[in-house]
Amino acid sequence: MNMQITKILNNNVVVVIDDQQREKVVMGRGIGFQKRAGERINSSGIEKEYALSSHELNGRLSELLSHIPLEVMATCDRIISLAQERLGKLQDSIYISLTDHCQFAIKRFQQNVLLPNPLLWDIQRLYPKEFQLGEEALTIIDKRLGVQLPKDEVGFIAMHLVSAQMSGNMEDVAGVTQLMREMLQLIKFQFSLNYQEESLSYQRLVTHLKFLSWRILEHASINDSDESLQQAVKQNYPQAWQCAERIAIFIGLQYQRKISPAEIMFLAINIERVRKEH
């Protein structure tokens, strides 16, 4: 397939239009060397191509790749591919956010500027899959680029992966993580629990709290549920219901958000599962 160059970013990255008139950002060693806009290139020299979901994202990626070494982009692409194998489809913005983060993390490390991650402990426990991928990402960066980033970066990379699965940014992920931690603490103290983090009920609770936290921070809510079912849960699981109501009061005071009775019901069900294990 032949592609027409529309913009040369550097010797290794160009923007093209393919035969179907789709805009793409393509990479390949020396692919833009002594080339001009309007010329055509053969796909045999392309090592990687990106056709992101919008012209805006393609533009942001083009700007980013114009000043990032090919090796760094290729390394981040490998990390993203690995993440998508494990987590499923990620938002296209991950190509921009994670690559930009890793490039600056490498620069900070080379300048001996270390950025602590205050949420590292929480990220490890609340997002174990993403945290493991973050650990593997550091190994990939070390092997490919010869840079041994500190463990705090595991947490930052994991947060980018969490963000790419949802419709938020890093600030949103930090807010969700903080709210999840607070709710887990409230449940733990009410029932004097020692969480069994490998148990299915705990993992279900964490998953529920993650999506509940996103809904709370985005002013969304589940409202569609049978009132008789709510009453049944309240009667059958009175302790869990009371705990869920206390969490609703806390969120109202701390975040000025109102939780619907349906949300309280689903939260109580998940709390009861964990409480029963204790």
From Swiss-Prot:
Gene Ontology MF terms: RNA binding
Keyword Aminoacyl-tRNA synthetase tagged: no
Free-text function comment from the UniProt entry: Mediates the positive regulation of the beta-glucoside (bgl) operon by functioning as a transcriptional antiterminator. This is an RNA-binding protein that recognizes a specific sequence located just upstream of two termination sites within the operon.
Changes after translation: Phosphorylated and inactivated by BglF (eII-bgl). The degree of phosphorylation is dependent on the presence or absence of beta-glucosides which act as inducers of the operon expression. Addition of inducer result in the rapid dephosphorylation of BglG.
Keyword terms: Activator, Phosphoprotein, Repeat, RNA-binding, Transcription, Transcription regulation
SUPFAM superfamilies, per database record: PTS-regulatory domain, PRD, SacY-like RNA-binding domain
GO BP terms, alphabetized: positive regulation of DNA-templated transcription
Phosphoprotein in keyword set: yes
Gene: bglG
Species of origin: Escherichia coli (strain K12)
Positions of the PRD domain: 67-171, 172-278
Taxonomic lineage: Bacteria, Pseudomonadati, Pseudomonadota, Gammaproteobacteria, Enterobacterales
PROSITE patterns: PRD_1, PRD_2
InterPro entries hit by this protein: BglG_antiterminators, CAT_RNA-bd_dom, CAT_RNA-bd_dom_sf, PRD, PRD_sf, Transcrpt_antitermin_CS
Designated name of the protein: Cryptic beta-glucoside bgl operon antiterminator
Family: Belongs to the transcriptional antiterminator BglG family.
